[in-house]
Amino acid sequence: MIRSELFGELRALGYDVDPGDLGENVTTSGLDLERLPLGTLLSLGASAVIELTGLRTPCVLIDRYRAGLQSRMIDAASTGPRFRCGVLGVVKADGLVVAGDNVAATVPQKPWRLLPAL
C-alpha cells in the first residue's frame, strides 16, 4: 500500500511515477501510512481488513525503474532511516475493494511501536 500523496512529492522532484508503478496493490489518500503504528487495522470497503506489519524497504529495482528514485524513498531520522515507499500488511478479512472505497484506520492500544522495515 502506498499513499497517493507520495506521487505528487516525487513528481515535484522530477520523477514520473503513477499509482501502480511501484508494485503496490492499494493506493490510499489522506492517511500517512508510514507513520501508523505496527498492528494498525485498515478497513477497506465493506469488509476487507489489512493488519499493518511493516514498512516496504526500497530495493535496487526502484532505481532500475527510475534512476535515483531509491534514495528519494529514504528519509533521515534521529532513530535511523525511515522508508516512505509504502507499507506491508496481512489480510485479516477478505472482501471486494474497488476504487473510491473508504479506508478507515484502527490503531492498537498504546504503547505503540513503529512499523519495522521489512
Segments (PLM) and residue ranges:
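Metal-cofactor-dependent catalytic cores
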Residues: 1-118
